[in-house]
Amino acid sequence: MSVVSMKQLLEAGVHFGHQTRRWNPKMEEYIFTERNGIYIIDLQKTVKLIDTAYNYMKDVAANDGVALFVGTKKQAQDAIEEEATRAGQYYVNHRWLGGTLTNWKTIQSRIARLKELKKMSEDGTFDVLPKKEVAVLTKQREKLERFLGGIEDMPRIPDVMFIVDPHKEQIAVKEAQKLHIPIVAMVDTNTDPDDIDYVIPSNDDAIRAVRLITSKMADAFVEGKQGQDDAQQETADDNAANETVSEDSLKNLKNSVEGKED
């Protein structure tokens, strides 16, 4: 049984691509049709590719792997943080700092500074410092927390990265490629899929679409880490409660779908 149902994908708006004038020709094989100037993603392929990505993420987790979830666009920030945390993994959901992976030693020194500032605020050090100095240190801590809080406890370079919108996260993609870190990503119709190891053709702008697919990747890690079928059983229960969408229904998308904002 598939990890996610066609109905769930439709309801989350996963099938809405970008406007036809903003497309990458390499995504053609993942496009079902065009409607009102909007490309419609072939959800039959998305279902299969989610399964492939899920199984890969699960295998990485089962081998005690480390995952880094990346999504800095507003629509992805909450889902990235919440789902990575639920899976016991790590995340970057604000600006990607250049060198986060390729200059890991320097980043670790900034993380050490973040931990030092946290300790100072908790052990009473701030109470004996001048207010102006405390204000400066607090601002520094908040900035470090914003950009590095999600990887503060990451033990090493990740074994896999899940990325929402690799077109936006090009610096992260290039760093992963340089270090040969496999990438699983939500890839919209305006993105080059050649940079991605495990492509999930999907609307990467809709909050519900991002939440749905990010949660499935987190489920995969939870299942792999636990060595149990809890997440898979939840998926099966969800799918059993959903109506199936026939191939005829999918073909009728071109007559019923509404376009999304560019």
From Swiss-Prot:
The keyword Ribosomal protein applies. InterPro entries: Ribosomal_uS2, Ribosomal_uS2_bac/mit/plastid, Ribosomal_uS2_CS, Ribosomal_uS2_flav_dom_sf. PROSITE patterns: RIBOSOMAL_S2_1, RIBOSOMAL_S2_2. One of its GO terms (molecular function) is structural constituent of ribosome. Residues 224-262 are annotated as: Disordered. Signal peptide: none annotated. The keyword Ribonucleoprotein applies. One of its GO terms (biological process) is translation. One of its GO terms (cellular component) is cytosolic small ribosomal subunit. Keywords: Ribonucleoprotein, Ribosomal protein. Belongs to the universal ribosomal protein uS2 family. This is Small ribosomal subunit protein uS2. It comes from Limosilactobacillus reuteri (strain DSM 20016). The lineage of its organism: Bacteria, Bacillati, Bacillota, Bacilli, Lactobacillales.
